[in-house]
Amino acid sequence: SYQIKNPMIDITEKSAAVADKEGNDILVFQEDGLKGEVHTTMPIEKVSVSEQGIVSAILKSDTAMKVICYDTAGNILVEHKTSLAGSGYPVDVALSANGQMMQVLYLYTQDGRIEGRLHYYNFGDAGKDKTDHQVTKKNYKNTIMASGFFMDENTSAAIGDNAMVIYTGKDIPKQNVK
């Protein structure tokens, strides 16, 4: 049995991740039952799961924020440390179905102005020579980007308080519609 006090879930066609919001446990399920368990070192804010069961999570504490990808055994695949002064506060995370592309939405503030930031990280060949695997970065002034998701392998979207953007491109996403 599992003790999940504040459950949140992300579902794909073949996998599901159940996480304890503000807790430290993520359970990954597939058709044949429990596929894996992840125990985090910091409280969980958001999760996203790929078809294979790779999990991406936004973790936060009072002093630090991280975006980490785990395999189904709980091993860390990728770890991005974030800061308010750097990329901003991570608001949402989404993984492509194959787990190769990660979309992260950040909220950044400076001198009383807000900016939504949308970053894409490619863990395949397209991102292997890039710093932190980052292949696309776009800033949206006076916009809070709140929710992002992949529609298919080639298309993703982000929704903000005054904008909706659609990106296309399997390896290096480019803004297609605003």
Regions found by a protein language model. Name each.
Residues 1, 32-39, 76-83, 128-139, ...:
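A short beta-strand motif characteristic of beta-propeller blades
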Residues 1-42:
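Post-signal peptide N-terminal segment of secreted/secretory-pathway proteins
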Residues 2-13, 42-53, 86-95, 137-153, ...:
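Repeated scaffold domains used in trafficking and secretory/extracellular systems
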Residues 16, 54-56, 99-102, 156:
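Hydrophobic beta-strand positions that form the internal "hydrophobic ladder"
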Residues 19, 57-60, 104-107, 158-160:
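Residue-level marker for isolated small/hydroxyl-bearing positions within beta-strands
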Residues 24-28, 63-69, 110-122, 161-169:
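Structural motif
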Residues 29-33, 70-75, 123-126, 169-172:
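Short loop/turn segments that connect beta-strands within beta-propeller blades
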Residues 152-178:
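Eukaryotic tandem repeat interaction scaffolds
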